[in-house]
Regions:
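Single conserved hydrophobic/aromatic residue that forms the stacking wall/gate
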Residues: 1-8, 12-13
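Charged, cofactor-coupling segments
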Residues: 23, 27-70, 130-247
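Long, K/E/R/D-enriched contiguous segments that form extended
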Residues: 43, 53, 57-102, 108, ...
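Functionally critical, mid-to-C-terminal surface segments that flank or help form catalytic/ligand
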Residues: 84-155, 159
Length: 247
């Protein structure tokens, strides 16, 4: 999947396509992977600056998402509840948005109110194996999923499906993102959601921003976890991406 401009902001929704022309100043989000000879899948996402250089606004948002991505990679370990990791990523994203003046209060309050789903209306990751989205229903059978579904519905979010405790041998994606989706912003604003937490006037300057997501694949080991690909990972930092696009 590839999206740019406002379509890039909707790349958290499946089956969005764009046949538009890339424009300087826009972002290009590429979510892709490959299947090996053993039929196991991979799934990666990078967000590139079309012009070869991120604007300062884009760089600010990108580095917030990268901080959440790296924190998740450091947290994944055997027997860790994946929802705890999901919420930790939300807190880092919230702290970054607060620092930019797009949200008010504390990160904890933003997460508790469900406000982060305005900016990342999808789960942090999914299981991966012979299918790109592998065994997603496991979380629904692992414990009382109805409670999780109820919490999600109250906050107006998607349902967090990856609710099981991760075990050695599990492969999960790590894919936080921040998206500025005009239709979703307008809906939450009209319904009076997240008053005192989201600064809707400040968001007006981001309506044409699009979205940023960073995704890698992580395998859980007996003692922790490691990123698949190791030091051969796809360029990921601002400098690395600008070097690739600017060639």
């Amino acid at each position: 999947e590839i999206g740019s401009g406002l379509v890039g902001s909707e790349m958290c929704i499946r089956d969005r396509h764009s046949d538009g022309v890339l424009q300087n100043g826009r972002l290009l989000l590429c979510d892709a992977g490959a299947e090996g000879l053993s039929y196991y899948c991979s799934d990666h996402t990078r967000t590139y600056p079309v012009s070869g250089k991120f604007t300062q606004k884009q760089k600010d948002i990108y580095n917030i998402v990268l901080a959440a991505h790296d924190r998740v990679a450091a947290m994944i370990a055997p027997h860790m509840p994946y929802m705890d990791i999901h919420n930790a990523s939300y807190r880092i994203l919230a702290e970054g948005l607060i620092s930019l003046g797009l949200m008010r209060g504390t990160a904890e309050d933003a997460v508790a109110a469900g406000a982060m789903t305005l900016f990342m209306p999808h789960g942090l990751g999914h299981g991966m194996g012979l299918d790109v989205h592998d065994c997603e229903a496991i979380g629904e059978r692992s414990f009382d999923f109805s409670e999780i579904a109820e919490q999600a519905a109250k906050s107006g979010t998607c349902i967090q499906r990856s609710t099981w405790r991760i075990e050695p041998g599990t492969v999960m994606t790590d894919e936080p993102g921040i998206y500025f989706i005009p239709a979703l912003i307008d809906k939450c604003r009209a319904e009076g959601k997240y008053k005192g937490i989201v600064d809707y006037e400040a968001l007006d300057a981001y309506r044409d921003f699009g979205g940023i997501r960073i995704e890698d694949d992580i395998i859980v080991t007996e003692t922790g976890s490691r990123m698949i690909g190791g030091d051969k990972r796809i360029p990921i930092t601002v400098d690395e991406l600008e070097a690739v696009v600017g060639r």
